[in-house]
From Swiss-Prot:
The keyword NADP applies. NDH-1 can be composed of about 15 different subunits; different subcomplexes with different compositions have been identified which probably have different functions. It comes from the Bacteria. NDH-1 shuttles electrons from an unknown electron donor, via FMN and iron-sulfur (Fe-S) centers, to quinones in the respiratory and/or the photosynthetic chain. The immediate electron acceptor for the enzyme in this species is believed to be plastoquinone. Couples the redox reaction to proton translocation, and thus conserves the redox energy in a proton gradient. Cyanobacterial NDH-1 also plays a role in inorganic carbon-concentration. Its main location: membrane. This is NAD(P)H-quinone oxidoreductase subunit O. Keywords: Membrane, NAD, NADP, Plastoquinone, Quinone, Thylakoid, Translocase, Transport. Belongs to the complex I NdhO subunit family.
Amino acid sequence: MTDSIPKKPLKKGSLVFVDKENYIKSIEALASDNDLPNYVFEGPGEILSLKDEYAQVRWRRPVPDVWLKLDQLKEYTH
């Protein structure tokens, strides 16, 4: 038996930020600008939609929504 608390799944409406370590190691990072703005790592962004292993995230800034893999996102708790 483990004492770890199960991780809550991210869902539509969840507030999130990008986990920098997971993003930098991803294949998506190789295909994108490696100098992402700080706000994606600080959060919060809101999940608008989910499809398979991806989430559409809207940031609280006048920028386009982006699709990111769920394993690159963490729940924003501040």
